[in-house]
Curated annotation (Swiss-Prot):
Entry-linked SUPFAM superfamilies: S-adenosyl-L-methionine-dependent methyltransferases
Primary localisation category: cytoplasm
InterPro entries tied to this protein: PCMT (IPR000682), SAM-dependent_MTases_sf (IPR029063)
Residues forming the catalytic site: 60
Gene Ontology MF terms: protein-L-isoaspartate (D-aspartate) O-methyltransferase activity
One GO term (biological process): methylation
Pfam family, any one: PCMT
Name the record gives this protein: Protein-L-isoaspartate O-methyltransferase
Reactions performed catalytically: [protein]-L-isoaspartate + S-adenosyl-L-methionine = [protein]-L-isoaspartate alpha-methyl ester + S-adenosyl-L-homocysteine
Length: 225
């Protein structure tokens, strides 16, 4: 039903996502309602489809953002720390920050310096206080390595498909924490995986099939056709 969720405004888009049962969390709904996708996607921001933002990067479709926030809702709580790998436009980073509140921190890590600059510009349009308070921190770096300086994280979101689950990211997951990551399987298909750390052990669960751009090095992304 996600493909029927497009709207003419941000509010209509998010209402359609909920009406089509793409997500159930009231907190995720409130977060997405409060962050206008139009600030982050230059073309057709309220269409339920991925949008190109330059530098061979995309902002994921709204239904995937809704699903990710839904799966992470019990870990994106007041005061929590979260990591958004491949933060791109900054959209989901801000949504996550809305859910962890004033005392929480969300680190967005992005390896394209132009997108780091773009995301901060996007955030300052209507959510500059998130940057000023330190609720949102945008870092230039290789997201596959996470950001150990602020670890451990209660929630980790990865916005591109990895060939396997990076150990650096599971190492930075807090006890009781959860990571949502698209993973490319040996047959080339991709699955959205829920990774939980319970009693120091990693538990993995496939929740749905997905299509994402690959999680690569900066050089590979530059050269991708």
């Amino acid at each position: 039903m996600a493909w029927r969720s497009s709207g003419s405004t941000n509010s209509e888009l998010i209402d359609n996502l909920r009406n089509n049962r793409v997500f159930a969390s009231q907190r995720a709904y409130d977060a997405m309602k409060s962050v206008d996708r139009g600030d982050f996607a230059p073309r057709a921001p309220y269409e339920d489809a991925p949008q190109r933002i330059g530098y061979n990067a995309t902002v994921s479709a709204p239904h995937m953002h809704a699903a990710a926030l839904d799966y992470l809702q019990n870990h994106l709580v007041a005061g929590a720390k979260a990591l958004d790998v491949g933060s791109g436009s900054g959209y989901l980073t801000v949504c996550m920050a809305m859910m962890v509140g004033r005392n929480g921190t969300v680190v967005g890590i992005e390896h394209m310096p132009q997108l780091v600059e773009l995301s901060e510009k996007n955030i300052r349009k209507h959510h500059s206080e998130q940057l000023e308070r330190g609720n949102v921190i945008i870092i230039e770096g290789d997201g596959r390595q996470g950001f150990a300086e602020k670890a451990p994280y209660n929630a980790i979101h990865v916005g591109a498909a990895s060939k396997g689950v990076p150990k650096a990211l599971t190492d930075q997951l807090a006890e009781g924490g959860r990571m949502m990551i698209p993973v490319e399987q040996v047959d080339g298909n991709q699955v959205f995986m829920q990774i939980d750390k319970i009693n120091g052990k990693i538990e993995q669960k496939i929740v749905e099939h997905v299509i994402y751009v690959p999680l690569t090095s900066r050089e590979e992304q530059w050269n991708r056709n």
